[in-house]
A protein has these predicted regions:
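Eukaryote-skewed repeat-based solenoidal scaffolds used as protein-protein interaction platforms
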Residues: 1-195, 201
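Alpha-helical oligomerization segments
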Residues: 171, 178-269
Length: 269
């Protein structure tokens, strides 16, 4: 059953089928190399993140997203340079890292999260929200007092939520979703992508808000109505949800042969 509020099921079905073909090619390419470049692991992680968001939007059962989530986190851990200093954030895209870790929390990818957390700790990456979420699977993980981007009002609201009692935290997340999340300043290039041609739109899911709700065991009934809140990813598939294959079906030939629209990222057509 379609979960997205801005595009129809056909859009996501075709987009995920195309992306599946691309990801299969990337995986085969990685396996064929004795020592792939770290950027190649990033490309795979980026594509898997896009797939998870679009597949969730389409209505694919949550349980079928666990395997690609683990694969995404493992690939991302391999893209981090072990000898680099990431104390200032390095070259990692913060919003993407926070979203991936949030997916891992929601989909219970414990071992993959622990592995990524160890890699981030080794390179000196320190951020309050990232560490707060990683402590869900590794309670002794160091929790720094500050955000990497303390001037960001949306991130400050999330931090405020984590320091509040449960009732206040739920209200903080409600305010975040309704006033701070879907803004051009917060989403940047992803803002308004549902109006653009091609398949740039992945879904506007705030995985971080649901992950915080899970870690804090919040009553999120009030958040369920937000078009940005991935309720099912936290609570699981509704009763009666049919089984789905772990991987989506391959794209039909007609999709493989269509001319590509101008790309925003490597996996967009």
């Amino acid at each position: 059953m379609l979960r997205d509020h801005f595009k129809d099921e056909q859009y996501f079905r075709e987009a995920t089928a195309r992306l599946k073909v691309t990801l299969d090619g990337k995986k085969k390419d990685l396996l064929s190399k004795a020592q792939p470049y770290r950027m190649e692991y990033y490309v795979l992680a980026d594509g898997l993140s896009a797939y998870i968001s679009m597949a969730y939007s389409q209505g694919i059962p949550v349980r079928s997203l666990v395997a690609p989530c683990k694969e995404m986190l493992d690939a991302y851990a391999h893209c981090v340079e072990p000898d680099a200093d990431y104390s200032d954030g390095g070259g990692l895209i913060y919003s993407q890292l926070l979203s991936m870790i949030s997916m891992g929390v929601l989909l219970d990818a414990k071992e993959a999260l622990q592995g990524l957390g160890s890699v981030l700790a080794d390179v000196g990456y320190k951020d309050y929200l990232v560490s707060f979420l990683l402590r869900y699977v590794q309670p002794t993980y160091e929790l720094p007092g500050e955000l990497l981007w303390p001037e960001d009002p949306a991130l400050e609201k999330l931090k405020e939520a984590t320091k509040s009692n449960k009732a206040e935290a739920a209200e903080d997340l409600y305010e975040y979703l309704h006033k701070l999340y879907y803004t051009r300043d917060n989403l940047e290039d992803d803002y308004g992508t549902h109006k653009k041609p091609g398949n740039a739109y992945l879904g506007y899911w705030s995985f971080e808000s649901a992950a915080i709700a899970k870690v804090m065991n919040l009553d999120d009934a009030k958040l369920k109505g937000s078009p940005y809140y991935p309720y099912d990813m936290l609570h699981g598939d509704p009763p009666g949800t049919p089984e789905a294959p772990v991987e989506p079906p391959p794209a039909p030939d007609s999709l493989r042969e269509e001319p590509a629209a101008p790309k925003k990222k490597w996996w967009q057509f």
